[in-house]
UniProtKB/Swiss-Prot annotation:
InterPro entries for the chain: Int8 (IPR038751), TPR-like_helical_dom_sf (IPR011990)
Complexes and interactors: Component of the Integrator complex, composed of core subunits INTS1, INTS2, INTS3, INTS4, INTS5, INTS6, INTS7, INTS8, INTS9/RC74, INTS10, INTS11/CPSF3L, INTS12, INTS13, INTS14 and INTS15. The core complex associates with protein phosphatase 2A subunits PPP2CA and PPP2R1A, to form the Integrator-PP2A (INTAC) complex.
The protein's name in its UniProt record: Integrator complex subunit 8
Family per record: Belongs to the Integrator subunit 8 family.
Physiological role: Component of the integrator complex, a multiprotein complex that terminates RNA polymerase II (Pol II) transcription in the promoter-proximal region of genes.
Upper classification of the organism: Eukaryota, Metazoa, Chordata, Craniata, Vertebrata
Disease: Neurodevelopmental disorder with cerebellar hypoplasia and spasticity: An autosomal recessive neurodevelopmental disorder characterized by global developmental delay, profound intellectual disability, seizures, absent speech, spasticity, facial and limb dysmorphism, and subtle structural brain abnormalities including cerebellar hypoplasia.
Length: 995
């Protein structure tokens, strides 16, 4: 053998050998092996693994000669395996914390049921009917263990669990996990049904005044012996491990408290019970000490529960004065005593007892309330934020963005409060040097961030600032501030001689120009301009601000005024008036226009008419933004002035097109159809395109109730809009000699551009006029040859069904216009069902099925009091229902499809059955069966689930079909009522899903 080989062999033989893992069946062969194994310092397999192995082997199903799966046999081998599992649990002293952590719910359920069985608890007997006081101690303890585990499992299941990262997919593992998940859910369902009984059992246990005993490995061996070999020791003897009454009550109180606390989320009154149990637990822990064998309670978690209960159920007795800061803060927040919260936070800056995260959560809650419209909380938000910022500074953290935002506009009150918080948060006698340094740096940074020297002086002269900063540091701070922007005056006190320096003319002019920009008082504007013109005659003061804009049709006339002062005054008054009107400051706009009108009346009839026109537009806007929104008709003199404007024939008067638009829209909005159709002068129809359009709209609305043959104006309106949406064609010869066709958008073929038409429509509010326009554009959209899904609209039949020259229409622009119009109309009235249906159809046509369902459901909801009444059949037509069916089908919500098939006038069984056959459904499936009223569909469901072997779902379908109100022999009214009730519930459920 070579030297290398010898070394290798020596190294290999010198390694310690890992003893082989003991197999589960070895414990069957040697009775004493289990105790020896469990006495090892690190037994392999671990005790909990042994429990799993023993119970897994004992519960394995058997296969008979006919290859049929049989339940596990009740033979000696399986009984011994179950006993071994119980003995391992006894070795662990029945510690539920250990067992729950390591065993799954099905395994622990099986283990505790075996404990009940071996403890002679009669199977099938309700624990709540048993008298614990008369039961043998070990039997009573077994019952308590099971019911404690039951409510602990229910509580644990209510907590969110982070899903484990899935490994590589293996079919066998996935099937096993799915089976275990279903089994766990079934057990939890049973435990929740019995939860009330379990709580009663545990409440009864608190009344016991005797010690109990828990099974040990020895008592389990005795129970397993033949009755004649027990040597006189019985189950009621003291052979088990003693559990003192106080220990048992302490553990039960804690578990009951957790159960009550979990129930409090749905019934707040139960929090009182939880509080009582948790505080009793604290008392019992103080009595028995923390070294108890059978009372393992997480005292930190218990303290958290107690604090939460203090907040949720504040005590009314004398202990309320000893509330924790948590409880005090929550009580103050509930009662709106925010000043007390601020005081608690300031005191906490010294004690540092409240976590920073908790303080931040309080600030977030206050911000949320302030954003909801409670403006009084803005000051409170700043004060709480200041307290939190000082806490951050003391602990060496950076200043939050929130504080910087709230301190953007400092004032005396904010700085006073900040200095108060800083002073009360630092104990200068006990504070460390690093803490003092943090506070000093913070105050320096605040000073450097301030521009107003008055505020800088407030901080620099404060006692805390003087104490924390040395003379050299204060001097250095002043030097730093001197190097900043020169616009900041660095003198602590104003220099008296500064006021003796005479201001230059340019400074005075600048100040007056600044006042001129800010002022909206006509008299003050006039005075400023007189002063400015007295100082200099070279400037044109209408150019001072580039924000002063006057329409180009007016500016030529105004700038032609020879007198400079008058020209500036007229221009500025008009510009400011137009700006005020734009920002809806109508009162100032009226003052400015009135002053301008008075001024120009003296020398210019042309400008006088201009101002009258602008004041008319202002009065229209004022009415529309004020009483017009409440539906109050405008005064008759305003209507007369609008008519006068439309009929005006003064030559050389500059006119703004927007005034004509607003006047025509005003007449349409207030249903002045008689005037527009019969009284408008003929020359207006030829010269003003908006009057022409308004006349056609008014006439179409007026003729709408009449027969189709008489609707000539509808055809005229159609032709006008088609012409507007048409494109002009040009021919171009390319380099290769070929002639190509070019479409030029926004052509001049129509009476106005499409963009102008859209702008005009967005000034309308009258529902019928908007419906007519929307209907026209929908029809124009549907005329396309390549359209797949038509959009529906009211009055669509009044329009022509074809266009002679389809190629000339810009259908892309039409589609965009339809979407714009629907968006606008719904902003005017979001509860108009016909407009909602159009919006839904648009989404349907563009394959946005979830959004389409949202609007179909909203259309039904607005006309049925959220489905509490029947949806009118003219809203949910067969076409709408079929589109809803298609949406659900394409969203893979196949059960919803089947239910909607019932809404059709003739139930579509073929589609319903086909959808129910789909197994990959993304909806609630069998939870929807209660909404089916058609017995044929329910019968098909029963057959389908029976065929698939889906017993639970089949039972749900049978339960639904067995309801007496669906009996075919019932009167028609009863059947209709049953159907209507299910329709209502289903549509409300759908609305909650898609809204």
């Amino acid at each position: 053998m070579s030297a290398e080989a010898a070394d290798r062999e020596a190294a290999t033989s010198s390694r310690p050998c890992t003893p082989p893992q003991t197999c589960w069946f070895e414990f069957l062969l040697e009775e004493s092996l289990l105790e020896k194994h469990l006495r090892k310092p690190c037994p392999d397999p671990a005790p909990v693994q042994l429990i799993v192995q023993f119970l897994e082997q004992a519960s394995k199903p058997s296969v008979n000669e006919q290859n049929q799966v049989q339940p596990p046999p009740d033979n000696k081998r399986n009984r011994i395996l179950k006993l071994l599992a119980l003995k391992v649990a006894a070795h662990l002293k029945w510690d539920l914390d250990i067992l729950e952590k390591s065993l799954s719910v099905p395994v622990l359920n099986m283990l505790l049921n075996e404990l009940l069985c071996i403890s002679k608890v009669p199977p099938g007997t309700k624990h709540v009917d048993m008298d614990l006081a008369t039961l043998p101690p070990t039997t009573a303890m077994a019952v308590l263990l099971y019911n404690r585990w039951a409510i602990r499992t229910i509580v644990q299941s209510s907590f969110p669990v982070k899903q484990a990262k899935p490994g590589p997919p293996q079919l066998s593992v996935m099937n096993q996990m799915q089976q275990e998940k279903e089994l766990t859910e079934n057990i939890l369902k049973v435990l929740k049904e019995q939860a009330a009984d379990s709580i009663l059992v545990l409440e009864a246990a608190l009344k016991l005044n005797k010690d109990l005993y828990v099974h040990t490995m020895r008592t389990l061996d005795l129970l397993a012996m033949e009755p004649g070999m027990v040597n006189g020791e019985t189950e009621s003897s003291t052979a088990g491990l003693k559990v003192k009454t106080e220990e048992m009550q302490c553990q039960v109180c804690y578990d009951l408290g957790a159960a009550y606390f979990q129930q409090g989320s749905t019934n707040s009154a139960v929090y009182e019970n939880a509080r009582e149990k948790f505080f009793r637990t604290k008392e019992l822990i103080a009595e028995i000490g923390s070294l108890s064998l059978h009372c393992t309670i997480d005292e930190k978690r218990l303290a958290g529960y107690c604090q939460a209960c203090d907040v949720l159920v504040p005590s009314s007795d004398s202990t309320s004065q000893q509330l924790t800061p948590y409880s005090q803060v929550h009580i103050c927040l509930r009662s709106g005593n925010y000043q007390e919260v601020i005081q608690i936070f300031i005191e906490d800056n010294l004690t540092l007892s409240l976590p920073v995260q908790f303080r931040q959560s309080v600030l977030r809650e206050l911000f949320k309330k302030a954003q909801q419209g409670n403006e009084a909380l803005d000051e409170i938000c700043f004060k709480v934020c200041a307290c939190n910022t000082v806490r951050d500074i003391l602990e060496g953290r950076t200043i939050s963005v929130q504080f910087n935002q709230l301190f953007l506009r400092p004032n005396k009150e904010k700085i006073d409060f900040l200095l108060e918080v800083c002073s009360r948060s630092v104990n200068l006698e006990k504070a460390s040097e690093s803490l003092k340094g943090n506070m000093a740096a913070f105050l320096k940074n605040v000073c450097l961030g301030l521009e107003d020297l008055q505020y800088v002086f407030m901080i620099s002269s404060h006692e805390l600032f003087i104490t924390l900063l040395k003379d050299e540091e204060r001097k250095l701070l002043v030097d730093q501030m001197r190097k900043r922007s020169p616009r900041v005056n660095l003198c602590i006190k104003p220099v008296t001689s500064f006021y003796d320096i005479p201001a230059s003319a340019s400074v005075n002019i600048g100040q007056l120009e600044h006042q001129l920009i800010l002022s909206v008082d006509p008299w003050r504007i006039r005075q400023i301009l007189i002063e400015l013109h007295g100082m200099t005659s070279e400037r044109q003061f209408w150019t001072v601000s580039n924000k002063w804009e006057v329409p180009s049709v007016y500016s030529g006339v105004i700038l032609g005024i020879k007198d400079n002062l008058t020209r500036d005054l007229v221009y500025i008054l008009m510009a400011k008036g137009l700006h005020c009107s734009t920002v809806k400051d109508f009162s100032h706009a009226k003052q400015l226009f009135a002053a301008c009108l008075e001024l120009v009346t003296e020398f210019s009839p042309k400008l006088r008419q201009v101002m009258l026109n602008e004041m008319l537009l202002l009065d229209i806007h004022t009415h529309e933004a004020g009483t017009g929104q409440a539906g109050e008709r405008p005064p008759s003199d305003l209507i007369s002035r609008v008519r006068g404007y439309l009929e005006m024939r003064l030559p050389d008067i500059p006119l703004r097109q927007v005034i004509a638009e607003e006047c025509v829209a005003f007449m349409l909005n207030w249903r002045e159809n008689e005037y527009l159709t019969l009284q408008v002068p003929a020359f207006l129809l030829q010269s003003n395109p908006y009057v022409k359009l308004g006349q056609l709209l008014a006439a179409t609305c007026k003729e709408l109730p009449g027969p189709k043959e008489s609707r000539r104006t509808a055809k005229d309106l159609w032709e006008v809009v088609v012409q507007i949406c048409s494109v002009s064609s040009q021919h171009k010869r390319g380099n290769d000699g070929r002639v190509s066709l070019i479409k030029q958008r926004e052509s001049t073929l129509g009476i106005m551009y499409r963009s102008e038409l859209l702008s005009f429509i967005k000034k309308l509010r009258e529902p019928l006029v908007l419906t007519i326009i929307l209907s026209l554009f929908v029809k124009l959209h549907n005329v396309r040859e390549d359209i797949v899904n038509d959009i529906t609209a009211e009055h669509i039949s009044i329009w022509p069904s074809s266009i002679p020259n389809l190629q000339s229409v810009d259908f892309e622009a039409v589609a965009i216009t339809v979407k714009e119009l629907v968006r606008y109309t719904l902003s005017i009235n979001p509860n108009n069902h016909s407009w909602l249906i159009i919006q839904a159809d648009i989404y349907f046509a563009t394959n946005q099925y979830s959004a389409a369902l949202h609007y179909y459901l909203q259309a039904g909801a607005v006309c049925s009091d959220f489905f509490n009444k029947a949806v009118p059949p003219d809203v949910y037509t067969d076409q709408v229902i079929k589109r809803m069916i298609k949406c659900c089908s394409l969203l893979n919500c196949h059960t919803q499809v089947a239910i909607l098939c019932q809404f059709l006038r003739e139930i579509d069984y073929k589609t319903a059955f086909k959808s129910l056959q789909e197994q990959n459904s993304h909806d609630a499936m069998d939870s929807y069966y209660d909404y089916i009223w058609d017995v044929t569909i329910l019968e098909y469901l029963t057959y389908l689930h029976h065929k698939r072997g889906e017993t639970d779902k089949r039972q749900i379908a049978i339960k639904a079909i067995g309801q007496t109100e669906l009996n075919a022999s019932n009167p028609e009214e009863v059947l209709q009522l049953a159907a209507q009730r299910r329709k209502k519930k289903f549509l409300q459920a759908m609305a909650k899903l898609y809204f």
